[in-house]
């Protein structure tokens, strides 16, 4: 990283024009496999799957890759032979997949440079905004705002069908023409777009082999559409008073009317758009491929927003967005899945006793409350896919972990359980979370029994029931001085208050699977 920073400081005025030579630098591919870089704010840790190649960068393979990239004849040969799908003419599929993955990861590091240069100064200017990165910081905002709104647009963000759209969007950030040509060649020549993106999923599911590169391309696309969307929203908010002629005060009335007429003449078409979407109670939240657009307005207004979004993606990004990907629902009888929670607005009826002189009477009132619960069935499906239980929720052993030591097995299961408790601490109903913990606990016991070639009962009798005490470290044990326990049972003891932690910067892996499924 220091070498990369030295390169940028050496020629800082032209840093974006000299990104392409970095592709031939060996340290770039070392950075791509560096754990510190992979755990940055941009991406999750990467791994090479299905190739028999570990996460450590091999200098020999990198040097061979750079040598082959220098050979222009083999590059031209590869362009003329699409059916072989071999990087720079290599005939071995192992090296083909491995080379393409190394190139995609290395190029992703290079593409990050313009973005990181924009983000680093802002993080230094606002050091107190660290907690705003927390995923849980979104939910207090939703609790405060959504309970007063009427309708919500549940949006599955569409993805561009053609690769050229992503390359053109990236041109706004990178002016290095050779790098863009190299990216275009890599996308069109060495991969089949239908294999990289699965149309049946809710959003574009990037292959694990090239996750890093394609995620930054997808984020560039999302940033582009949100820039235009937020601009329109801000303009409609700040200029909404220009359409309220009937409510002008009488002081200098005719002068104000003339001023408004001048505005209408200059910006007639744009103001029609602003009036079309006038709504001062509009809130937008997005995470990954899902977004919600909530409004306090009428059904007609929220329907206009839906039509606008469909036309916006069609005319600005030149691809058709299917209307059924955007759902209009009233908050009163609708639940939506977001960030690992099933969220809804509950209506709680209550009666208030009032007294006027000597007469007593009851007044029925309705209060709205934002509610979040743990999705049990999807989480069980996620555990089933991870081989912790069956599809019906019956715990099974984890054979791949049976070769580890007892402490490692308990530590792995315990870490998963504690992370789930930590992430889903904002649930209003903890009973669902207890079922997930029970599955993990019994799966851990069966894995230990499988290792020792025994039964779960004999294992617990021989080692003692306290073997898994550390496995179920409850969240309330940490915050018990603040929130007293509501029950004496250690397995089911939990506070009823919802708690949002500001140290969670990424979604839990089990809940993360739900977001992409």
UniProtKB/Swiss-Prot annotation:
InterPro entries documented for this protein: Domain_X, Maturase_MatK, Maturase_MatK_N
Alphabetic keyword roster: Chloroplast, mRNA processing, Plastid, RNA-binding, tRNA processing
Subcellular location: Plastid, Chloroplast
Chief localisation class: plastid
GO BP term (any one): mRNA processing
Keyword Chloroplast among UniProt keywords: yes
Molecular-function GO terms, alphabetical: RNA binding
This protein's GO CC annotations: chloroplast
Pfam families, per database record: Intron_maturas2, MatK_N
Similarity comment text for this entry: Belongs to the intron maturase 2 family. MatK subfamily.
Job description of the protein: Usually encoded in the trnK tRNA gene intron. Probably assists in splicing its own and other chloroplast group II introns.
HAMAP family: MatK
PANTHER family listed in its UniProt record: MATURASE K
Protein's name according to its UniProt entry: Maturase K
Species in which this protein is naturally found: Trillium maculatum
């Amino acid at each position: 990283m220091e070498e990369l920073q030295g390169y940028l400081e050496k020629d800082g005025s032209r840093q974006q024009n000299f990104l392409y030579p970095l592709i031939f630098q060996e340290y770039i591919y070392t950075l791509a496999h560096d754990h510190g870089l992979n755990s940055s704010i941009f991406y999750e840790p990467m791994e090479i799957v299905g190739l028999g190649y570990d996460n450590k960068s091999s200098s020999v393979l990198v040097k061979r890759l750079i040598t082959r990239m220098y050979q222009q004849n083999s590059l031209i040969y590869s362009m003329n032979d699409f059916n072989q799908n071999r990087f720079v003419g290599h005939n071995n599929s192992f090296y083909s997949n491995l080379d393409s993955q190394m190139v995609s990861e290395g190029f992703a590091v290079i593409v990050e440079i313009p973005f990181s240069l924009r983000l680093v100064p802002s993080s230094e200017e606002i050091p107190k905004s660290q907690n705003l990165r927390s995923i849980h910081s979104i939910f207090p905002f939703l609790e405060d705002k959504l309970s007063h709104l009427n309708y919500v647009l549940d949006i599955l963000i569409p993805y561009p069908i053609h690769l050229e759209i992503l390359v053109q969007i990236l041109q706004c950030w990178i002016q290095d023409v050779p790098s863009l040509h190299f990216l275009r060649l890599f996308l069109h020549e060495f991969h089949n777009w239908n294999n990289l993106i699965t149309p049946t999923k809710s959003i574009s599911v990037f292959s694990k082999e090239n996750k890093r590169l394609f995620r930054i391309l997808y984020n560039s696309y999302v940033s582009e559409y949100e820039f235009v969307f937020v601009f329109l929203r801000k303009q409609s908010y700040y200029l909404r008073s220009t359409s309220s002629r009937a409510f002008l005060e009488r002081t200098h009335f005719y002068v104000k009317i003339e001023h408004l007429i001048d505005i209408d003449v200059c910006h007639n078409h744009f103001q029609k758009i602003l009036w079309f979407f006038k709504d001062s109670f509009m809130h937008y939240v997005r995470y990954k491929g899902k977004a919600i657009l909530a409004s306090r307005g009428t059904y007609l207004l929220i329907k206009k927003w839906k039509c606008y979004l469909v036309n916006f993606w069609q005319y600005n990004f030149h691809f058709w967005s299917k209307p059924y990907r955007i759902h209009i629902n009233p908050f009163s009888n609708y639940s939506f899945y977001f960030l690992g929670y099933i969220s809804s607005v509950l209506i709680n009826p209550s009666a208030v006793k009032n007294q006027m002189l000597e007469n007593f009477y009851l007044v029925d009132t309705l209060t709205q409350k934002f509610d979040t619960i743990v999705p049990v069935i999807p989480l069980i499906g996620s555990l089933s896919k991870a081989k912790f239980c069956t599809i019906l929720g019956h715990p099974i052993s984890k054979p791949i972990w049976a070769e580890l030591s007892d402490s490692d097995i308990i530590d792995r299961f315990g870490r998963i359980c504690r992370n789930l408790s930590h992430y889903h601490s904002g649930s209003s109903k903890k009973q669902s979370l207890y079922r997930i913990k029970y599955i993990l606990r019994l799966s851990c016991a069966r894995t230990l029994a499988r290792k020792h070639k025994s039964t779960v009962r004999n294992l617990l009798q021989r080692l003692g029931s306290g073997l898994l005490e550390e496995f179920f470290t409850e969240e309330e044990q940490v915050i018990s001085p603040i929130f007293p326990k509501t029950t004496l049972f250690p397995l089911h003891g939990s506070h009823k208050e919802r708690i949002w932690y500001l140290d969670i910067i990424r979604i839990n892996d089990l809940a993360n699977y739900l977001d992409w499924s």
